[in-house]
């Protein structure tokens, strides 16, 4: 289809009054996630229980760019942003339609309060986006737009999420994609056990989410046990704050729940849903 035809199809789809979509934060693993005996099934079961989205807005830990950037609005090649893996991981395809109407909605929601927005039309989906989407929406028939993390400041990211929250009432699934603990220097081999810092941070985060203790989550580096062991940098926890903002603005923090838990190579794969 031509760009103009894709735009018309997407606009019509988003004009249908849908139910409010949840907001998700998921741990996306790495390309070998597809070979795990359990994790792909957990992601597939999760998506099977969701309302069908009109479009998906992805915020991945693997794209930091300021000002906030909108990725491709038509199908372009994936970004294989990893090195040293077997060749078949570089042949994974996920040709989801672009989401130009969603991109325009994002521009309006963010620019109205004066937030600068830029377009990066050749930027495809990175592995933080497509690895989980392959398992959750394998037909690649839902339009997807990826946006960048414009900052790693948790409060500013929550504000971005709050501004994007109205999209949930237009059938848009907002997904923050990171990893609940992420310290690659301490990665364990399969079956190598779970390091204490990863288990402690995961338990703390689970309790903070259950208690809706947003202040503690915002200050995770100091409020949590082993915060900087769990996250030497903030980028894999950062997408959670966009999700929290989208949930908070819609009054859905009380409706949060963990959907996936456990560990993968010593890292916590906790994933949560609001609404």
What annotation goes with each model-predicted range?
Residues 13-117:
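A short aromatic-anchored loop/beta-hairpin motif
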Residues 24-25, 81-88, 136-145, 218:
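Short, basic/glycine-rich phosphate-binding loops at helix/coil junctions
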């Amino acid at each position: 289809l031509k760009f103009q035809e894709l735009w018309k199809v997407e606009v019509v789809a988003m004009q249908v009054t849908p139910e409010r979509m949840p907001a998700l934060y998921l741990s996306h693993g790495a390309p070998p996630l597809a070979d795990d005996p359990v994790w792909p099934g957990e992601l597939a079961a999760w998506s099977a229980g969701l309302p069908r989205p009109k479009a998906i807005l992805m915020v991945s830990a693997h794209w930091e760019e300021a000002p906030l950037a909108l990725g491709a609005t038509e199908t372009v090649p994936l970004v294989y942003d990893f090195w040293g893996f077997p060749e078949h991981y570089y042949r994974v395809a996920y040709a989801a339609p672009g989401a130009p109407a969603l991109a325009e909605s994002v521009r309006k929601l963010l620019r109205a309060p004066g937030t600068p927005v830029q377009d990066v039309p050749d930027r495809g989906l990175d592995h933080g986006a497509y690895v989980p989407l392959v398992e959750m929406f394998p037909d690649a028939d839902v339009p997807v737009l990826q946006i960048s993390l414009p900052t790693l400041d948790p409060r500013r990211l929550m504000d971005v999420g709050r501004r994007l929250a109205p999209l949930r009432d237009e059938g848009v699934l907002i997904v923050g994609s990171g990893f609940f603990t992420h310290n690659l220097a301490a990665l364990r081999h399969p079956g190598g056990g779970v390091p204490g810092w990863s288990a402690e941070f995961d338990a703390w985060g689970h309790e903070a989410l259950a208690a809706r203790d947003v202040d503690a989550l915002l200050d995770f580096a100091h409020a949590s046990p082993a915060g900087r062991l769990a996250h030497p940098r903030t980028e894999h926890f950062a997408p959670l704050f966009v999700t929290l903002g989208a949930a908070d603005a819609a009054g859905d923090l009380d409706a949060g729940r963990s959907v996936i838990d456990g560990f993968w190579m010593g890292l916590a794969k906790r994933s949560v849903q609001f609404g």
